[in-house]
Amino acid sequence: MNFNLLNKVIAGIVFIISFIVLFMTVQPSVSFWDCGEFIAASVSLQVPHPPGTPFFLLIGNIFSKLPIGENLGFRVNMISVISSALSILLLYLIAVKLIENYKGKKADNMFDAIATYVSAAIGALAFSFSDTFWFNGVEAEVYAFSTFLFAAVTYLIIRWNERADNKDSEKYILMIAYLVGLATGVHLMSVLAAVPVVMIIMFRKYVNDEESLKKTGYIFLGHIVIILLLAVFWWSSQKSQTAPTLEEYKDFDTKFKLFIAGISALIMGVYWKKIFTRNSFYMPLIIGGIALFATYPGVVKYLPELMTAIAGDNIVTEIIILALLFAGLGYGVHYSRKESKPTLHLVFMSFIFILVGFMTFAMVIIRSNQNPPMDENDPDTFTELVKYLNREQYGDFPTFKRRFATEPHQQIVYTGYSSDLDFFYTYQMNHMMTRYLLWNFAGR
C-alpha cells in the first residue's frame, strides 16, 4: 500500500476537521480586545497601536475585499480561521516527521502507518481544540497568523534537516529567513524561531562528536541550575513592603542581569576549552542568540534608529542608506560565492531575506503620511517611526520586581506576599500560568 498517499489523506482530513469547526464557531462580526481596531485598520490600511502589524493588515485588506459574507469583520476574521487550520495541518506533518525520526524509519507496514498517523492526528486535533488556540482561531487577532508562521518555519527546518546534504537545501533556510522577516510585521513571537533553527543547522552540519555535545550539555544544565538556585535565594530576600522608586527598579534589574552575566562568565571561563568548540552545546545556543539579536532588536529597532541618527527625517537620504545597505550585502553574497565560502554566503543571503520581509513596515510610514482616521502616534517621519517601533508610549516596566502596583486600589495587594519570590510563585506561576495552562486541558 502507498503509505505516503495515506499520510496525505489523513493530513487533509485533519485540516478539514479543524477548518470546519473553526468556521462554524468564527465570530460573525467584531469581537472584543484589539479585533475591532485590527479590522478597521485592515479595511482601510490605517495605523493601529505600536509597534504595528503591517503584514497582517496587508493580508487583512485582501481578505476584506473577498466576496465571502457581507460583514467586513467576518471577512477579516477568516484570516485566523484559515491560518489556524493550516497550522494544524503543519502540526500533523511535523508530528509525523518527528515520530519517523525517532523510530529511524518511515512506516513500512499498516500497523506502523496507523500508529504514526493516528497519533499525529490526535495530537494535532487536541491542539486545535485547546482553549487558547481555538479562542485565537476565530477572531481577527495576530496570534493565529503568527502561530501559522511559527509552524511553517518549524516544518521547513525539519524538511531542511532531511535534505541538508542536497545542493539546493539552502532554499529552505532562505524561505525561513523570509518568513522570520515577515513575522516582524505580525507578531514578534515567530522571531523566536531563529534560535532553534540555528541550533538545528549547527547540530546537523557542524557537530560531529556526540560525546562532547553530551558533556557540554551536562555543563549547561548545571550552569542553569546554579543560576536558578542563586537567583531564588536572592529573590526570596526581597521582602520590602514599600514600593521601590523607578531608580530602584532599574538598579535591581541591572544588578540582577550583571549577576547572571557574571556567574555565566565564571562558569564558561572555567570550562572554556570545552565550551568554545564546534562540538559544544553552547555554540549553537550562542550563535542562535546572535541570530535572534540580529533580527530583534537588530533589524527591527536598531536599524531604523541608526538610519534616523545619520539622516534625520530626510526620506531621500534614508532610501540611499537602505540602498547602500542592500548593495553591501549584495557584494557580500558575490564575494562569499566567488571565494567558495558557503556558510558566509548563506548568512548574507539570509540577512537580505530578513530585511526584505521587514520592509512591510514601510507601509506604516507611507499610510501615516496619508493621514488616515486611525493614525496612532502619527509615525509619518523616521523619528516618529522609531518611537512607534520602540513602543515608547508604554514607558518602562521592571523585568523582575513586578509585585508592586501604581494604582491606588491595587497597592494593598502586594502586602499580602512575603517576598518577590512568593509573589512570583503564588500569583504569577500558580494562579496565572498554571491555571491558564490547565484551561487548555482541564477546562475553565
Language-model features: where?
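Aromatic- and kink-enriched transmembrane "portal" helix at the membrane-lumen/periplasm boundary
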Residues: 25, 66-77, 102-113, 123-147, ...
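Short hydrophobic alpha-helices at membrane interfaces in multi-pass membrane enzymes
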Residues: 118-121, 156, 163-181, 211-226, ...
